[in-house]
Amino acid sequence: MGDFREWAAYGSSAVARGYRAPTLAAAMAQSLSHPVAIRRDSLRAAERRAADIVARVRPTDDSESKRKSVVAYVQKLIGVSLGSEVFPFGSVPLKTYLPDGDIDLTAFGSAAPDSTLISDVRCILEYEEQNSDAEFEVKDVQYINAEVRLVKCLIDNIIVDISFNQMGGLCTLCFLELVDRHIGKDHLFKRSIILIKAWCYYESRILGAHHGLISTYALETLVLYIFNLFHKTMDGPLAVLYRFLEYFSNFDWDNYCISLYGPVAIASLPDIVIEDTDIRSADLLLSQEFVKRSIKKFSLPLTESEKSSAKFCPKYLNIIDPLRENNNLGRSVSKG
């Protein structure tokens, strides 16, 4: 694997000789081993094994039916009682959830400071928890007073997170669905997300924003970055996982953010100055025009409170939201 320190040493000697040192982005893009360097028969066998793993953890007809029933149940409960609409977002409608994956819902209603929407939803679910005739078993209802306020519970032993007036989650869902269709290859983007999520959740234990770990959308953005740069050399989920691990295990997270088009020096913030990757724009998967259209279609106008804090705030892990560049998708990660 390439080592960032080797490139830094090269840069220092190059400057001494009068040459321009490569940017981090260019160094990273050039230093990765090419998957085809592995014997083709070995690579095909490994991809078949990876496909077996994806088949074991991907959504099934039974899991789809179960989750659809739970979503419909919550929609009916809240809709009949409060007249509020409830929509699923995240991994369930994207069909990239793991067997242990939760259901993300958002309920729409009054956003006024004196609104009782959140407490009303909590009361409805607490009533169902005591209702022996309820359609599904409801347990462990709790209110989470976090940056995004939630009512969390177990319904039929599936974790359900209900947020409120979260249009951003629906916009992100639409954007990722559009990207998957753009990539094609029998939903290679979604299959790769499933494999990489499985590795992050079951093997490395780094997935889970509520536990100070990386969020699902942040992970999906990192996967999308790998597709954007290396899509021409990737035809299976294992090749994507290989590129993902190779690239980000050597990334200089202490000094750089990651954006869809390359690293951004933390020292340059609040200005978003993307380093040159030495990859021609024509060779990238997503053109600037594609992203601009997506932002126009799926981004929301900033609220007054968001306008007052509209600068990207560096944390321990820094990932720039493709749809809103002042939003740090790595902000959930705490230092271990």
Residue map of PLM features:
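N-terminal regions immediately upstream of nucleotidyltransferase
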Residues: 1-100, 113-119, 136, 141-143, ...
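P-loop NTPase catalytic cores that bind/hydrolyze ATP
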Residues: 214-228
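Short amphipathic alpha-helical segments embedded in low-complexity Lys/Glu-rich regions
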Residues: 86-96, 139-150, 210-218, 236-245, ...
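Conserved beta-strand elements of beta-rich interaction domains across eukaryotes
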Residues: 93-94, 110-113, 148, 156-158, ...
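Conserved catalytic core of two-metal-ion nucleotidyltransferases
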Residues: 122-170, 191, 201
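Basic, alpha-helical interaction scaffolds
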Residues: 174-216
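Pol beta-like nucleotidyltransferase catalytic core
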Residues: 29-30, 39, 225-336
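Acidic, Ser/Thr-rich intrinsically disordered and amphipathic helical segments
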Residues: 45-49, 69-73, 116-120, 150, ...
